[in-house]
């Protein structure tokens, strides 16, 4: 791992990581020495080496968390720094650390005092990067454009916060072949047109830094519940009322991410937040409308309250707003609107009966408007 050739350093780290994953007794016996080596390589000049250092620390945390306990303050400092690395591959591997950290109940006492520093970093990294926006291309009205064949592929809808995407990604990310690692060293080479097209197509559905940080915030909310709110709510307020739509979008994403873990403690704020979110459905930016649909879906259990006054004040505007998004002129928003409406429908159950007329009108209009991909969701 100290070899002059960065390729050799990466291959060494990658090889040793496999022994961590299987809980090798020989690796356990030498773990202190290995952790010391990781600290030596933590400031390596090559981003790909730092990426594998972060990956190794995540593996150690998941397999032998007690080995990191004595140096946890230093590890936290390093991971906070690396989560904000200019190289997104490094940042993503570092962000995985917070996801693993939050899912490890044995470390909750060590994680708790660091929440005021971790939460702002996660929120910062949930903002769309310029590269992500560039790779998504034109995100304006596209409902009249026919679907491309590559657009029609399986996607995960609803359920736990991005967990299925992360699990799918993780199944193939544990071990990298020598050829795959060597290819990573050629990132500065020019892409051919087909490779670039593939990357553009995969951007929206791929596991990335933004989704990883949102998932980490979700798990932190499940683990610590009301304890995260004093640090999070002031930051959310700033973002939700920001003039910059990218900041607003990230704030709405964060609000949805904490829904499952903090629903009881967020309840006093929802009479203000739900109307605000309904208003966000009229935002000129499709990505804001799309994420607002998702977040409203996350709070659908509260919106579907049984009291008639509650339903008139909150449920009806949410239902009308989501049906409008089902008929939006942007395909991404249509998709999010359908998914959120399906979630709301499940929460309401038979109580939806009085509203069937507008629901059916919207769905019939959607059948006339949708192309093949969103038609599958509509069914």
Please give the residue ranges for each predicted region:
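Karyopherin-beta/Importin-beta family HEAT-repeat alpha-solenoid scaffold
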Residues: 1-379
């Amino acid at each position: 791992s100290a070899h002059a050739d960065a390729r050799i350093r990466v291959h060494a780290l990658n090889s040793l990581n496999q022994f961590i994953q299987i809980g090798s007794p020989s690796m356990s016996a030498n773990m202190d020495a290995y952790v010391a080596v990781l600290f030596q390589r933590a400031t390596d000049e090559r981003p790909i080496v730092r990426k594998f250092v972060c990956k190794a620390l995540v593996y150690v945390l998941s397999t032998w968390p007690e080995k990191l306990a004595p140096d946890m303050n230093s590890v936290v400092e390093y991971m906070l720094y690396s989560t904000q690395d200019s190289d997104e591959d490094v940042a993503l591997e570092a962000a995985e650390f917070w996801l693993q950290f939050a899912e490890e109940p044995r470390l909750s006492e060590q994680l708790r005092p660091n929440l005021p520093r971790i939460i702002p970093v996660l929120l910062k990294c949930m903002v769309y990067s310029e590269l992500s926006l560039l790779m998504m291309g034109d995100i304006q009205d596209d409902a009249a454009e026919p679907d491309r064949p590559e657009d029609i592929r399986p996607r995960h809808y609803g359920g736990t916060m991005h967990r299925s995407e992360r699990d799918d990604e993780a199944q193939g990310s544990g071990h990298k072949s020598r050829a795959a690692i060597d290819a990573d060293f050629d990132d500065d080479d020019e892409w051919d047109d087909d490779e670039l097209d593939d990357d553009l197509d995969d951007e929206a559905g791929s596991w990335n830094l933004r989704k990883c940080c949102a998932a980490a915030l979700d798990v932190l909310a499940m683990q610590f519940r009301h304890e995260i709110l004093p640090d999070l709510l002031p930051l959310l307020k700033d973002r939700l009322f920001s003039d910059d739509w990218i900041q607003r979008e990230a704030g709405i994403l964060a609000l949805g991410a904490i829904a499952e873990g903090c629903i009881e403690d967020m309840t006093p704020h929802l009479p203000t937040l739900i109307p605000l979110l309904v208003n966000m459905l009229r935002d000129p930016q499709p990505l804001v409308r799309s994420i607002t649909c998702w977040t409203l879906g996350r709070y659908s259990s509260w919106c579907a309250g049984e009291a008639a006054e509650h339903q008139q004040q909150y449920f009806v505007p949410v239902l009308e707003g989501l049906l409008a998004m089902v008929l939006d002129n942007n395909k991404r928003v249509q998709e999010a609107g359908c998914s959120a409406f399906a979630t709301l429908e499940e929460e309401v159950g038979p109580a939806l009966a009085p509203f069937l007329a507008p629901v059916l009108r919207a769905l019939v209009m959607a059948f006339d408007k949708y192309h093949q991909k969103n038609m599958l969701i509509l069914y």
